[in-house]
């Protein structure tokens, strides 16, 4: 998997630089998301991992994508096909998203709670995380009944566990030691 990261990095950087230069970051992210989804199709994955000529591979892939790809994106796919790298498109997408977040000074923050949070609670969490991280945050909320009460906040490798479950686990650890 780390090989995919290494292989995908220059493609993601090239796509991102092109998208920024042409003010088409949203469009390129959508195109990359679509192509990444196409590579997850079993039949396409078999085609891409088989011994097919790069030209045939790129033509077939572009035909499957149809109108979703503009001319520069088709050229991007051709280059990746020539180098046998179409299977790394999902990783290219992930790195493209990271580059975009870095450019926009945003960070994705996952907020897990036992029940839905109201707008006021979300605003307070967003403000606190923006202050702590010195960046804009994009909250991704999910319901997790195992949290019991409170919230668990994840941003990158940072975890803030304000859940009742987390408190009970920490209390149990203290009592056992």
From Swiss-Prot:
Signal peptide (residue range): none
Q: Which InterPro entries match?
A: ATP_synth_OSCP/delta_N_sf, ATPase_OSCP/d_CS, ATPase_OSCP/dsu
Q: How does it sit in the membrane?
A: Peripheral membrane protein
Q: What keyword terms does UniProt attach to this protein? A: ATP synthesis, Cell inner membrane, Cell membrane, CF(1), Hydrogen ion transport, Ion transport, Membrane, Transport
What cellular-component terms does GO give this entry?
A: plasma membrane; proton-transporting ATP synthase complex
**Location in the cell:** Cell inner membrane
Q: What are this entry's molecular-function GO terms?
A: proton-transporting ATP synthase activity, rotational mechanism
Question: Source organism's superkingdom?
Answer: Bacteria
* A Pfam family that the UniProt record links to this protein: OSCP
Question: Primary place of residence?
Answer: membrane
> What function does the entry list?
F(1)F(0) ATP synthase produces ATP from ADP in the presence of a proton or sodium gradient. F-type ATPases consist of two structural domains, F(1) containing the extramembraneous catalytic core and F(0) containing the membrane proton channel, linked together by a central stalk and a peripheral stalk. During catalysis, ATP synthesis in the catalytic domain of F(1) is coupled via a rotary mechanism of the central stalk subunits to proton translocation. This protein is part of the stalk that links CF(0) to CF(1). It either transmits conformational changes from CF(0) to CF(1) or is implicated in proton conduction.
HAMAP family, per database record: ATP_synth_delta_bact
Q: Family membership, please give it.
A: Belongs to the ATPase delta chain family.
Q: Subunit composition?
A: F-type ATPases have 2 components, F(1) - the catalytic core - and F(0) - the membrane proton channel. F(1) has five subunits: alpha(3), beta(3), gamma(1), delta(1), epsilon(1). F(0) has three main subunits: a(1), b(2) and c(10-14). The alpha and beta chains form an alternating ring which encloses part of the gamma chain. F(1) is attached to F(0) by a central stalk formed by the gamma and epsilon chains, while a peripheral stalk is formed by the delta and b chains.
* Name under which the protein is recorded: ATP synthase subunit delta
Q: State the species of origin.
A: Yersinia enterocolitica serotype O:8 / biotype 1B (strain NCTC 13174 / 8081)
Name the lineage.
Bacteria, Pseudomonadati, Pseudomonadota, Gammaproteobacteria, Enterobacterales
């Amino acid at each position: 998997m780390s090989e995919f990261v290494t292989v995908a990095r220059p493609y993601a950087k090239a796509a991102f630089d092109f998208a920024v230069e042409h003010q088409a970051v949203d469009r390129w992210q959508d195109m990359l998301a679509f192509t990444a989804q196409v590579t997850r199709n079993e039949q396409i994955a078999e085609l891409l991992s088989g011994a097919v000529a790069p030209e045939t591979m790129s033509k077939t892939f572009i035909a499957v994508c149809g109108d979703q790809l503009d001319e520069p994106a088709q050229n991007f796919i051709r280059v990746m096909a020539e180098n046998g790298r179409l299977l790394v498109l999902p990783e290219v997408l992930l790195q493209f998203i990271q580059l975009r977040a870095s450019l926009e000074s945003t960070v994705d923050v996952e907020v897990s709670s036992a029940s839905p949070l109201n707008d006021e609670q979300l605003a307070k969490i967003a403000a606190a995380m923006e202050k702590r991280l010195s960046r804009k945050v994009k909250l991704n909320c999910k319901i997790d009944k195992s949290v019991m009460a409170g919230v668990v906040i994840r941003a990158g490798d940072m975890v803030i566990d304000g859940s009742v479950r987390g408190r009970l686990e920490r209390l149990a650890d203290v009592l056992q030691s």
